[in-house]
Amino acid sequence: MRIGLQTASLLNLGGTSAGSGAKWSNSGKLMVGVAGEGKVDITAGGTLSSAQATIGKDVGSKGGVWIGDAGSTWTNSKSLIVGDHGSGTLNISSGARVSAGTFMLGNYETSDGTLTVDGQGTILETGLFGVGGGTNNSTADVNGKGAMYVYGGGTVKTSGSAIIGQIQNSQGDVYITTGGLWEIDKTLYVGSDSNGSVLVTAGGLLKSGEASCIACSSNANASVQISGSGSTWTEADHIEVGFFGNGALTIDDGARVSSGTPEDGYLLLSGVAGSTGVLNMGVGGLSGTLETAEVRGREGDARVNFNHGDFSEFKPRLTGSLNVSKIGSGSTLLFGRNDYTGETRVEGGTWAAGIEGAFSASSNHFIDAGGQLDLMGLNQNIGALNNSGVVSFPSWQGGAGTQLTVNGDYYGGGGLLLMNVALGADNSLADRLVVNGDTNGVTNIQVRNAGGSGSATEQGIQLVDVGGASAGVFKLQGRAVAGLYEYRLYQGGRDTPNDGGWYLRSQADPVDPVDPVGPLVPPSPPDGGEPQVPVSPTTPLLRPEPAAYLGNQLAALRMFQGTMHDRVGEQALDSRPGSIGTYGSWVRVQSRNLNSGAIGEQIGVKTNADVVQLGAERRFDVGASRVHAGVMAGYGHANTRGTSQVSQLQAQGKVSGKSIGLYSTWFQRQTTQPGAYIDVSVRYDRYDNQVNGDALGRERYDSRVFSGSIESGYALQITASDLNKVYIEPQVQVVYSDFRSDDVVETSGTHVRLGRGDGLTTRVGARLYGRELSGMRNRVQPFVAINWWSGGDDLAVAMDGQSLGGSLPKNIFESKVGAQLELGPGWSAWGQFAHQQGSRKYRDFNGQLGLKFSW
């Protein structure tokens, strides 16, 4: 029967009545759209049966069959062709069913066939299935187009094989989406002898039973993309991509493809010379999952591209002749013991090992500026290595001892090695790069301490072992520190300077490593001649941070420390008639510059501190004597700079603190007559501290100081005239200080503990001053003083259990010069300049100004 022989025709089976079910049986050939336009509608349970059927028979014809609703069926015992030479459309929906022995979409040149299978329960059942027939004329334009759309839960069941793009110059396309399913019992050919594509998205399902092929002939260009969460392709046997032609398989955005079983399945790329087979794991977003045992590359151009922005595990083994690229910004973690030949290029993101042997020992690796090769703490062997990016040795859990062996040559294109080292002595556990060939170029090394406490070294801790010519330059990026010690990178061991390797040493020699000018000659073995001359032990190199910690401790102990006259000036200026006050308030400011000498004979320490302190007091007359009792508070800040005299590295210390205290002073006499005094004070200080070493993180911690002082003096007149008297006042003072500090764990991992710094300091001195007797106001009372401070505060810092002392000189000698001034009724001021000096180049210069008002 022919529908649409020359003019438009319509056959409607089923109508619109509920439960109606027109039936039509045709034992011959059914043609819809022979030379004109024809259409068949099968709905509402209508049934159609035929032996053979063609939709869109001749050139220029248009045929269409629409079958919908549950119970509607079309049965073809032999073949069903949609688009023979013309244009054909078959639309199956809403639970309808169609079956055919053989099914073809776009059978010949000029044909165009479209199949749509839509809806839950909608089924197309076929034997052999073909999409895109085409022509045997190799010079013809691309024609013979077929397209199948399966979505919304629709199902296509193919008991035979399925061929997409089966004849030259044809084009076959399949789209499976939103829960659509295509089940193929035998082989799926995508691009059998022409162009074909399959796209599975949004939870679509594709199943094939026997080995499947993508680009199965030299004329074929074909691709399969499985994309989106829930989208899968399950192949029971194996998949061949680009066996003879140009084929690509893309798995992305959470999709999954299985090729055989994870134990013995495989995916084959590029079967013969001249073919191209590409596996794309991702297209820049999320990756997909490939479940198979191996990805094999054969004789042609086989490539695997990892182009994703997420973290993804890849478990199949990569083997054979393959070129591998890591493109996207994400991380690929490998669990196969890969042995492929060909290049590995990491252009972006991270190429990471999940097991030992994950990186192919037969592949030359190229790490571009945006890429990272991550050993994850697992030993690896590779071919040659060109590093313009990052090679990371440690695992996420830390630790050290990972080795990367480069069987060929190594070239550093300004790249970086991230290495963990348990920084200690020569035998410290360390990550290591072993190059069996030659080295060239420039490479930076960043070292992270893996729990080492620091130690003196002799030969050094080897990081790079070079078997060939060692013309490459390795530079330490940042710093390598542990405990008290600083490590630097040197070429050659201390006793084997020409061995070509690179070593970390804590060595105080102020000689920088020398850049090599050419290949180094390996040392000759000993010949039993003259005995070796013993080499003296290496002096370890101290880092400057201990000086900053000690400087902060010293600043905290000394910031608010002083004498009674430092604090309130000359009380006698308040005691003349007309100036006597019951109450008083005062303020003083002090600035000091302290050089505490070299710590460990390597680190110079300088501290600048500024203080403002104020107080209020009340006077009590007790018999012939008087007592001043008051409160005081203060704020101060200090900056310390520790500079290594060997490495010139610096560490900055900062202290800012607040102080509160009480004091009481007893004077033997109420008047200005000379006599004795006793001063007692207690003080509590609290400090915020910072230490910031060059190229290290900023450390913060708190500290506290409690101190008490008792001081006594007696003024004796030594000469007098009608206008002036001169007095000498011997003095003695005892100060107790108790320093406490939080522990610090630095970003480098070093544990820092500051000593308590408690102890007694004594002062013995004398003050010589003159006093005007004219009775005029605005008197000036100059003075000079000398003091001997003894005992001092024992400063100490322990870093990873190793202590470094910063004890001040036991004897410090001080000289002062200044004056007190009477400014007016109740007002007085004082100023002074002081200099302290002790052993170990200790120097302290300070000056202060004070102002007091009594009423």
Spell out what each predicted region is:
Residues 24-28, 49-50, 74-78, 97-103, ...:
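Surface-exposed loop/turn positions within long extracellular repeat scaffolds
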Residues 661, 747-855:
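Outer membrane beta-barrel transmembrane domains
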Residues 520-720, 832-835, 839-846, 852:
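Outer membrane beta-barrel translocator domains of Type V secretion systems
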Residues 4, 14, 33, 43, ...:
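Feature marks extracellular polysaccharide-active and adherence modules
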Residues 54, 80, 104, 137, ...:
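Outer-membrane beta-barrel domain signature
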Residues 2-4, 9, 22, 31-33, ...:
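Periodic glycine anchor positions in long extracellular repeat architectures
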Residues 289-290, 299, 307, 313, ...:
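Extracellular beta-solenoid/beta-roll
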Residues 89, 418, 584-588, 628-632, ...:
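Residue-level detector of the transmembrane beta-barrel scaffold of outer-membrane proteins
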